[in-house]
C-alpha cells in the first residue's frame, strides 16, 4: 500500500477517542473529535494551490486529502476549540512511492503551513515526521480493520515539554433506514502484552 491508497482507505467520517499524556506534568487528558476525510486527486484545485504555496511542482503530487475535525479535550477553557480543516498533498519520492514529502496547509503541532516527510512502514502504517521551528512531531496511523484506525503521536517541544497521544478512530456509517450516522460493529481481537 502507498500513502495515497492509505488516504483512500481513510475516506469517510470517523469518531476519535484520544488520550494525551503531558509528560512534564505526569498527567493524562482525554478528548474526542469527529473527523471527515475527503480524497483529492492530483488535479484538484486544493492540491494545486498547496503545491504552489510550498513552491513544489504540482505534477509531482499523487493527490491528497481534505480533512475536517471538531472536537474537545477535558482541560479546555471556554475560549478554546478544536475545530478546523487542512489539506494534505502527497509528493512521493521518485525512487520509492512509499515515502516522500507531505505538504500540509496546517500542521499538527503548530498552526502554520509545513512540509514534512511520510513513510509507509512494513505493516502498512503511515508515519509522518514533521520539524517545526520550535518543536518536532512524529505521528503513526494504522488500520486494525477497515473500520478501525489507530493513531499515535509524540510532540517534542524545545524546553522539554513533551506530549504523547494515542487515538482510536472508528468509522461512522450512514444508516439506510433514517439517514442517521451510526458506529459499526467492530470485531476486536484481544492481545496480551505477555503473549497470552
Swiss-Prot record:
This protein's UniProt keywords:
Lyase
Gene3D superfamilies on file: 2.40.128.20
The Enzyme Commission number assigned here is 4.-.-.-
Picking any one GO molecular function of the record gives: lyase activity
- Per its UniProt record, what InterPro entries does this chain match? Calycin, CpcS/CpeS
Under the heading CDD domains, the entry gives: lipocalin_CpcS-CpeS
Return the similarity comment.
Answer: Belongs to the CpcS/CpeS biliprotein lyase family.
Its biological purpose is as follows: Covalently attaches a chromophore to Cys residue(s) of phycobiliproteins.
User: What name is this protein filed under?
Assistant: Chromophore lyase CpcS/CpeS 2
Q: What is the lineage of its organism?
A: Bacteria, Bacillati, Cyanobacteriota, Cyanophyceae, Oscillatoriophycideae
Q: Which gene encodes it?
A: cpcS2
Amino acid at each position: 500500500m502507498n500513502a495515497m491508497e492509505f488516504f483512500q482507505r481513510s475516506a469517510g467520517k470517523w469518531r476519535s477517542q484520544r488520550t494525551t499524556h503531558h509528560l512534564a506534568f505526569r498527567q493524562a487528558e482525554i478528548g474526542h473529535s469527529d473527523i471527515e476525510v475527503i480524497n483529492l486527486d492530483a488535479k484538484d484545485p486544493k492540491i494545486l494551490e498547496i503545491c504552489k504555496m510550498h513552491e513544489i511542482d504540482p505534477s509531482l503530487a499523487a493527490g491528497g486529502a481534505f480533512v475536517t475535525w471538531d472536537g474537545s479535550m477535558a482541560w479546555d477553557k471556554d475560549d478554546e476549540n478544536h475545530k478546523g480543516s487542512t489539506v494534505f498533498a502527497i509528493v512521493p519520492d521518485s525512487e520509492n512511492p512509499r515515502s516522500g514529502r507531505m505538504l500540509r496547509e496546517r500542521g499538527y503541532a503548530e498552526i502554520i503551513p509545513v512540509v514534512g516527510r511520510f513513510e509507509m512502514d512494513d505493516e502498512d502504517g503511515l508515519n509522518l515526521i514533521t520539524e517545526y521551528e520550535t518543536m518536532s512531531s512524529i505521528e503513526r496511523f494504522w488500520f486494525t480493520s477497515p473500520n478501525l484506525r489507530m493513531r499515535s503521536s509524540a510532540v517534542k517541544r524545545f524546553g522539554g515539554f513533551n506530549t504523547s497521544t494515542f487515538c482510536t478512530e472508528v468509522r461512522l456509517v450512514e444508516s439506510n433506514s433514517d439517514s442517521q450516522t451510526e458506529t459499526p460493529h467492530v470485531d476486536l481481537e484481544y492481545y496480551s502484552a505477555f503473549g497470552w
